[in-house]
């Protein structure tokens, strides 16, 4: 059951991922589809009006010039409230600025050090595998994700999936595919370690095959192939992350290879692809282990995916940014009795601290409880009339 506002203000949980107030939505007012997507997203996710950024520019192309982007970026920076940590971009085209992806240009500003010349390494992201939950505050960067799709119906379905995934603790599988495509299979060397690191967290299958079909439990699907067949036979759970390591997947609307949009159309909630030939550096693509670890901590899709790419300059992130399938859930099950669901990628301890005043001091209320890998159910008593305030923390 939902609990009273009084109980919500008296029981505090750790912040595990972005909230609606942390996201600014960027709309192109000259693009009717962008307006429709942005307005629906604001309404569906309860994004504050102050976080809505409305621009005007021509959308009839895939690539924006550096000069044009820098002018837009000045406006975006001016209109972005200081507290905002990330951007949701309400269009599909343009998806690229010069040699950079639009999402990385928004995060870092346009700078050619984030692009590869002659297959050289590019500038790294300080956000890679970072514990930070406030990238704008800690690193002066705001990760971005595109609410991408070829029709309003598609993007609406994507947004609705993201919302449906929140606190849902899906019991899905992680599929890590080692394919016959040598140039695109370089993530496979890390799969065994990933399986070890995430044992007991997600059911994980490492398969030596080019594709899977007829599975209805897909939560993660990481592969390396120019075209991924049989997507229409799969059932993706709300919140699913999926991508195919290939050089042109991020060319959303005009790729000669499979566009990353096909993952979203098939039912994934977020995906990733590169917008220019990146050379086959694994650092330019998501690390499955890092993405799954941060997702399991309760991070949002945009945080987990962004943290999984070491060199994201040429890569575009698409999907529903705020999807949080593993964020903790607190429920009142009876008067004075609560149930907390916590998902964790590691073992730890839960501390319940109590104070008669909201300002503290908080003292240990009961013996710390063990948190195991995966899903944990914790029950506790709390009388909001007499017990003051509780602070729940785990590591």
Model-derived segments and spans:
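Cysteine-dependent hydrolase recognition
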Residues: 8-341, 345-349, 357-359
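Low-complexity, Ser/Thr/Pro-rich intrinsically disordered linker/stalk segments at domain junctions
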Residues: 326-395
């Amino acid at each position: 059951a939902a609990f009273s506002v009084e109980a919500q203000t008296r029981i505090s949980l750790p912040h595990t991922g972005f909230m609606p107030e942390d996201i600014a939505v960027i709309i192109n007012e000259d693009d009717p589809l962008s307006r429709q997507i942005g307005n629906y997203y604001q309404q569906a996710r309860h994004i504050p009006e102050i976080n809505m950024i409305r621009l005007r520019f021509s959308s009839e192309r895939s690539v924006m010039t550096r000069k044009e982007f820098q002018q837009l970026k000045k406006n975006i920076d001016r209109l972005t409230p200081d507290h905002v940590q990330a951007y949701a971009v309400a269009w599909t085209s343009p998806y690229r600025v010069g040699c950079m992806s639009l999402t990385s240009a928004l995060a870092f500003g346009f700078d050619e050090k984030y692009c590869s010349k002659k297959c050289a390494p590019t500038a790294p992201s300080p956000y890679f595998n970072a514990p930070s939950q406030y990238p704008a505050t800690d690193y002066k960067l705001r990760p971005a994700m595109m609410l991408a799709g070829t029709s309003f119906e598609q993007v609406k379905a994507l947004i609705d999936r993201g919302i449906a995934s929140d606190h849902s603790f899906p019991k899905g599988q992680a599929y890590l595919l080692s394919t016959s495509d040598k140039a695109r299979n370089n993530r496979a060397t890390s799969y065994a370690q990933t399986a070890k690191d995430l044992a007991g967290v997600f059911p994980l299958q490492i398969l030596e095959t080019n594709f899977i079909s007829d599975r209805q439990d897909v939560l993660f699907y990481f592969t390396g192939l120019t075209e991924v067949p049989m997507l229409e036979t799969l059932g993706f759970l709300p919140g699913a992350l999926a991508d195919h390591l290939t050089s042109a997947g991020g060319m959303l609307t005009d790729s000669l290879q499979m566009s990353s949009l096909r993952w979203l159309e098939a039912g994934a909630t977020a995906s990733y692809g590169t917008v220019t030939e990146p050379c086959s550096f694994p650092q330019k693509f998501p690390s499955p282990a890092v993405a799954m670890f941060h997702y399991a901590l309760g991070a949002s899709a945009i945080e987990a995916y962004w943290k999984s790419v070491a060199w994201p300059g040429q890569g575009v992130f698409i999907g529903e940014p705020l999807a949080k399938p593993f964020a903790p859930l607190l429920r009142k099950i009876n008067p004075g009795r609560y149930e907390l669901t916590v998902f964790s990628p590691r073992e730890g301890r839960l501390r319940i601290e109590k104070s008669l005043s909201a300002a503290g001091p908080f003292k240990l209320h009961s013996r710390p409880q063990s948190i195991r890998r995966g899903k944990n159910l914790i029950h506790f008593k709390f009388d909001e009339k007499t017990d003051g305030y509780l602070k729940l923390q785990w590591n």
